[in-house]
Amino acid sequence: TTIKLSSDLLMNQEYSLQLSLETNKGTAYYYTRVVSRSNVNAAQYVKFVASFYEKCLDKASAEDLTAYLESDTSSTSTNYTDININSTFAQISWGNLNPQIYRKGIPVVKDINETTASLSVEYQIAALDEDGNQEIYDVTEFYRMRYTETRIMLLDFKRSVSQVFEESSISISDKGLLLGVRDKNVEYMMNENAGVLAFVQEGDLWSYSPDDGKFSRIFSFRKETDGDFRDSRYQHNIKIIRVEDNGDVDFVLYGYMNRGVREGYCGVCVYHYSNDQNV
C-alpha cells in the first residue's frame, strides 16, 4: 500500500502520522514518524546493509568486510549471541557454523539525515548440528553508518542471535536442558515438586516433563509449514504466571500480535493451557 501526503511538509521537521484501519472488529490505529529530507542516500544505505549481512555468510566475500570492523584481536570468544563492531572476523563471519539464509530480511530505517543513518534488519539462518539436524536462528542486526563521496563508513554494528527451539534438536545433559544459542536470561517456572517445567524461547512457550521426557509447545505464532516473515517477528513476550502439578500453565502474552483474530494489534492476553486437552 502506498500513501501520498498532500500536506506541505517543512524540510527537516519531524511529524507524527496516525493511520486508521477500519475492520469488522473495530478501528485499528497505527503510528509512525514522517520527515522530509533531501540527499539522505537511503538507497545506498539499504544496499550496504543487505550486502553486509549476506557477505558475512560467505567466507570469501566476508574478507571485504574487515575494512569496516574495529576488531579486538585478543578476543577468543566463540559466542554468537552478542556480536559487535569490535568482534573478530571469525565471529562476524559465523565461525564454524556455516549457516545459510533461511529467510531474508528487510532493512528498516530507524533514523536518517544528510550525513548518517541507523538501520536494522531481522532475518533467519539455518545450519546443521553435529547429527545433521537443521537448526533455525533468529538474527537481529543494527547498523549506524556515515555516507562519504568515496565510501560508506560503518560507525557501529551490533548483532544478536537466538536459536529457535525445536523438538528435533533437543539436547539434555547432566546439567539440564540445553537451549542453544541465546542470552542467559531465561523466563521459566516449575511446579512445586519440579515435575513440570515451563520456559520461553524466542517468543514461544514450551513445557517439559523430566519424568517422561515429554515436550509440549504451548504457544507460538510460528507455523509448522508454509511460514512467512511473521514467524520471526519478535515484538511480543510471555510472562509465566503459574505451573500446576498436572501440567496446566497460566501465562500472559503481551506486545504485538503476529497472527490470529488480533493480528496487527498490540495488547495483553491472559491464557490458561490445559495439559490434558493440549489447548
Q: Which sequence ranges carry the predicted segments?
A:
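A short, surface-exposed beta-strand/turn
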Residues: 131-156, 267-276
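Short, surface-exposed charged micro-motifs
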Residues: 108-109, 142-144, 187, 196-197
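Short, solvent-exposed aromatic-acidic interface loops
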Residues: 35, 156-166
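Well-ordered beta-strand positions in beta-sheet-rich domains
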Residues: 2, 29-34, 106, 136-144
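Surface-exposed, charged secondary-structure patches
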Residues: 1-16, 87-133, 237-245
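Beta-strand elements of well-folded, non-transmembrane domains
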Residues: 23, 123-127, 149
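Core segments of small alpha/beta cavity-forming domains
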Residues: 1, 14-97, 172-214, 220-223, ...
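Short linear interaction motifs
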Residues: 99-102, 120-136, 166-187, 229-235
